[in-house]
A protein has these predicted regions:
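Active-site-adjacent helix/loop patches that line small-molecule binding or acyl-intermediate pockets
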Residues: 1-72, 115-118
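Short beta-strand segments within Ig-like beta-sandwich modules, predominantly Fibronectin type-III
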Residues: 348-352
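Short strand-edge motifs at loop-to-beta-strand transitions and within beta-strands
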Residues: 354-356
């Protein structure tokens, strides 16, 4: 999810919607989006809405308010244009009431924010930073259909809508860049990317305050997991550093099982030897092939995990794992040593068999 949100990947977004729909139904997703002030859905809420497939779309004010709810720990406040009115004649004061609605748990809000802070650090919102302040960021574009590209005589690479949203614990800023009509002109990913970041940097550096951090709720815990485990497992002491990632979880939902993919091998057992006067033949009981490099196990592993969702990916993940193992681990083999009279070990050779023959002459 972290990489998908930072890089604005569409497929994971739809996959997430599909899985949540299976659990709670599409209506609950619609209710959640509506509670954030995003409600241009018409009569039906369909998966395409998860990628911004609206009839007319939303606007920067609504998007700013929606993202502010994440920065506010899950509390949504409908936008308003003034805080108070003071009547000149009577000096009577009217203070605009602030209606706060909890639309998500503070744990959910913080975990999404933590991901988007990483996006901000990576420059999604723009090339700027505020001293001592966390800045969360989310960018995005929309594309056009082949028929629209032909009708308006614009390239298929045209991206009519460019979005850039950033928020801190204190403020939320949303920016839209584009043309109201394709007949007025068009942008592409290349021509829209830098301007939207530059405009945001110019605005944000004049608004955001220094020294403001998002506070992690007590209901959020961190755990170091091993990438490529399905379902998710904790990293072991042998997990390579490039396959470790420290992620956030709602307390009680963090993984508890430690991955056994990377581990020490068992020792061979029942070693025997024979000597015929010139050669020594030693043999032993071969160790079992660990599941992590057993093709039969891995095929069953991926087919089983992806049986409920996206079975078409099982073969791809399986082949990726086989390729990784071939490049980084290899096959089971045995290094054979001779111990001399002084106790030193001398390497005799390597074998993938469970026996080795050595000439003693």
């Amino acid at each position: 999810m972290r990489r998908a949100l930072i890089n604005s990947r569409n497929v994971p977004a739809i996959q997430a919607i599909q899985q949540v729909v299976d659990e709670v139904g599409m209506d609950q997703i619609k209710e959640f989006a509506t509670s954030l002030g995003i409600d241009d859905y018409g009569t039906d809420f369909v998966e395409a809405k998860g990628l911004g497939g609206f009839t007319y779309g939303t606007d920067p004010l609504a998007m700013s308010a929606a993202y502010a709810a994440f920065g506010r720990g899950g509390i949504y406040i409908e936008p308003y244009t003034f805080t108070r009115i003071v009547y000149i004649e009577t000096e009577e004061e009217y203070v605009h009431p602030i209606e706060q609605t909890r639309v998500m748990s503070e744990e959910t809000a913080y975990m999404i924010t933590d991901i988007l802070v990483d996006a901000g650090v990576s420059g999604v919102g723009g090339n700027f930073s505020i001293q001592g302040t966390d800045i969360a960021a989310k960018g995005g574009t929309s594309t056009i259909s082949a028929s629209d590209a032909e009708a308006y005589d614009v390239p298929r690479s045209a991206t009519p809508n460019h979005w850039n949203i950033t928020y801190s614990p204190d403020y939320s800023i949303a920016l839209w860049l584009g043309h109201d009509k394709l007949t007025d002109g068009y942008l592409t990913s290349g021509t829209g990317y830098n301007p939207r970041r530059q405009i945001m940097a110019a605005v944000a550096t004049r608004i955001y305050e220094t020294g403001s951090r998002f506070e992690q709720p007590s209901g959020v815990v961190s755990a170091t997991i091993e990438l490529g485990t399905y379902p998710l497992q904790l990293a072991s002491e042998y997990t390579p550093s490039n396959l470790k990632s420290t992620e956030l979880f709602k307390a009680g939902y963090e993984p508890t099982e430690v991955s056994s993919r990377f581990d020490t091998l068992a020792d061979p057992t029942n070693g025997t030897s024979t000597y015929d006067g010139s050669t020594i033949r030693i043999s032993w009981d071969a160790i079992e092939i660990p599941d992590a490099i057993n093709p039969d196990y891995l095929e069953e592993y991926f087919n089983g995990y992806f049986s409920d969702y996206y079975a078409e990916y099982a073969e791809e993940y399986y082949q990726d794992r086989i390729a990784y193992n071939d490049a980084n681990i290899g096959t089971i083999g045995y290094q054979v040593y001779l111990q001399d009279a002084s106790g030193n070990l001398v390497s005799l050779g390597y074998t993938t068999n469970n026996y080795y023959t050595y000439s003693a002459s």
